[in-house]
Amino acid sequence: MRRLVLAAAVLLALPCAPAIAQTRIPEAALRQAAQLREQALADDTGWKVTESLTTEIGPRIAGSEADARAVAWAKAKFEQLGFDKVWTEPVTFPKWERRAEKAEVLGAHAQPLTITALGGSPGGTVQGEVVRFADLAALQAAPDGSLAGKIAFVDYQMTASRDGKDYGNGGAIRSRGPSAAIRKGAIGYVMRSAGTDSHRVPHTGITRFDEGLAPVPAAALSVPDANQLARLVERGPTRIRIALDCGWDGQATSYNVIGEITGREKPKEVVVIGGHLDSWDLGTGAVDDAAGVGITMAAGHLIGQLGQAPKRTIRVVAFANEEQGLYGGKAYAEAHGKDAADMKRHQIGAESDFGAGRIYAFNTGSANPAASREATAQIAQALAPLGIEYQPGKGGPGPDISPIAAKGAAWAWLAQDGSDYFHLHHTADDTLDKIDPKALAQNVAAYTVFAYLAAEAEGDFGSEFKAVTPPQE
């Protein structure tokens, strides 16, 4: 007993550690969110916006005439949907153009190959013997000079999964493979597309050439054509010709297009949601990323239709030129993440940019996640009827949110089912018919609930300014 009394006395004598102030969401807001959730499931605004962008604009590679029309479209759509404020912010970047592309097998087994130039590839015509590598590591391990006068072929088959994790390998082969090939002496580069389909539609995407290297033509083969080329190489020495008409053409300026539903109590504090407005030029950019634009515009619109404005401002951003290097996201972070005051105005941010599959998981993150743990759990509970699981410790910011998250902004992760995303990603098959309207509505409901509750929270989600360089890609 004496020991218990002594222990109690010691504890009373210790200085009290300050309790972490917990961000919470009022019950009235949770009730309103439940109504919004059901309303969003029955609403077709997200579908209509996605259909409009893909039909009226179509492919919209950054810096193109179609990209400029997409900017005008986004401004008009925000206004049509009743956003209080609509404006644009300039984003400048190098302009890359695709004009023509062709490849063929030469010699006794002559036949065409279905390819597409990788974004950032130079134009030119090369022909030579193909040397096949199973993956990027095998190419990097090849002896220096061993590919002199030859064309490197990296034949890695991506595996489909809900979280798309194998894109880490496929994307690296696309972005780093050409430079690795040049270092070994190659005059050209082809890769099995970074995709999980079996259709004769190649997947494009941006590539990079390391400083000091002379770029060479670089292209992706469709999956069936990669299989065909691999079989030919197995039979014996195989020569191919690649002819690309593409390349950089000066600088271009596009725009982040921003719409806001102004907050009633803290209008300078913002919940940021969005998708990217640009697409590659092969398909109509439906799953990548008209869906994200449609989902987040619709979420903002539904919140704006409430009789009472949200406590904080809902800011929806249609980001410029995500595809070629997060230019819109980096420009946004530069303009709106300059200092601690800027960062404190950012309650939290999330981007929809992984197709239109159903959202299956949710989490938030920041420099101080403990303070918002209760609010995050409350949002997760409101999302649970949509089939969304709370996964603490998982996830990360979306691509265009990552630059401002790197500077300290809190982020939310609404994980979309990407099981078939890489069947379509960056291909001519990325078209509206691949989107399930019911799955799209579930996404709209999730973003509406999340954005509204984050805006209504009593407290913040831990945004704290950090003076760091945003990620490059």
Regions found by a protein language model. Name each.
Residues 79, 173-174, 181, 257, ...:
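Alpha-helical metal-binding/catalytic segments enriched in His/Glu/Asp
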Residues 108-110, 123, 128, 216-218, ...:
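Metal-dependent peptidase/peptidase-like ectodomains
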Residues 182, 188, 192-193, 252, ...:
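Active-site-adjacent substrate-binding region
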Residues 64, 113-217, 284, 390:
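Extracellular/luminal Protease-associated
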Residues 25, 30-64, 201-206, 278, ...:
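N-terminal capping segment at the start of a domain
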Residues 23-24, 28-34, 51, 55-163:
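Noncatalytic luminal/extracellular "stalk/propeptide" segments of secretory-pathway proteins
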Residues 30-32, 108-144, 207-286, 298-301, ...:
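Soluble metallo-hydrolase cores and metallopeptidase-like ectodomains found primarily
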Residues 33-41, 55-65, 117, 128-133, ...:
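Second-shell loop/turn segments in exported
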